[in-house]
Design a protein with these regions (language model features):
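Active-site/ligand-binding loops adjacent to catalytic centers
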Residues: 3-23, 30, 72-83, 87-165, ...
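A glycine-rich, Thr/Ser-enriched phosphate-binding loop motif common to dinucleotide/cofactor-binding enzymes
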Residues: 25-39, 166-170
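Glycine-rich ThDP/TPP pyrophosphate-binding loop and its adjacent helix/strand module
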Residues: 36, 42, 47-69, 76
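Beta-strand segments within the central parallel beta-sheet cores of soluble alpha/beta enzyme folds
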Residues: 52-56, 81-90, 188-194
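Short glycine/threonine-rich catalytic loop with a Thr-x-Gly-x-Asp
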Residues: 58-62, 128, 163-169
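Short glycine/serine/threonine-rich phosphate/pyrophosphate-binding segments
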Residues: 60-67, 96-97, 170-176
Length: 245
């Protein structure tokens, strides 16, 4: 469709009402109930030891709304004795929630034309921002934004660990680095980095980064800081053996 996420969501809401289609965006409370179970799984995998931070990318802000709710419920049920801090990371070209956080008061000012290669968080008018704001504040957390270069480099380093994620997920690691450099996250603290999307959502991004062809919105060239450039080889076993040796 020739529209961005926010425009498409507005259209879907109209069609859902008109055609009786079930809307499963994060404005739907059942979506939040499902997403909060991610925190129960996380705690179970950590043997119910609470991390100091849970860091995740922020687009429509359903995940952070759900995570906060799930963690509060776990604490109320006596499963944990404290809440981890929630940190939301946005791409700088689509960062209305970060801007709201920096202002400290008032409502969210939508970004009309959000721009970022991290397509999963290319959202200018997140519907779940009131819930998200409550959960981040309640946890004592924070909101940060990162550049396209920071996202690209973080994605490459995640890939070096054998984990395939799409660009929006890499914003998490980029944000952790930034918050650690600023002293917001202490180097001795336990941090859970949530990667929300598989590499197959945006596989062309990898090739363009490693071949030096990746450009940010506006034509700004992304440097292949951790590039692993593909080598084109002939159909010749001797040549291939030579390269492998």
């Amino acid at each position: 469709m020739e529209a961005n996420f926010d425009q498409i969501l507005a259209l879907v809401r109209v069609l859902a009402e008109r055609l009786g289609i079930y809307l499963l965006n994060s404005m739907n409370p059942f979506r939040i109930e499902g997403q909060k179970s991610i925190m129960f799984e996380m705690l179970d995998q950590l043997d119910w030891r609470v991390p100091d931070w849970v860091v995740l990318p922020g687009g429509n802000l359903g995940n952070v709304s759900a995570f906060g709710k799930g963690l509060r419920e776990a604490k109320d049920a006596g499963l944990i004795d404290r809440l981890p801090k929630l940190a939301v990371i946005q791409a700088e070209g689509a960062a209305p929630f970060y801007d709201l956080w920096q202002r400290g008061s008032g409502g969210l000012c939508p970004v009309t034309n959000p721009e970022t290669l991290a397509t999963a968080i290319r959202i200018g008018d997140p519907v779940s921002w009131p819930k998200a704001l409550h959960e981040v504040r309640n946890s004592g957390g924070t909101v940060e934004k990162v550049t396209e270069q920071e996202i690209a480099d973080a994605k490459a380093q995640i890939g070096l660990c054998g984990i395939g994620c799409e660009p929006a997920s890499a914003a998490t690691l980029a944000g952790i680095r930034k918050l650690t450099a600023r002293g917001v996250i202490d180097r001795v603290e336990n941090v859970v980095a949530v990667l929300t999307g598989n590499v197959l959502k945006d596989s062309d991004y990898i090739y363009r980064y490693h071949t030096g062809q990746l450009e940010a919105p506006g034509g700004v060239k992304i440097q292949s800081t951790f590039g692993n450039k593909p080598i084109v080889v002939p159909n010749d076993p001797d040549k291939i053996a030579e390269l492998l040796n």
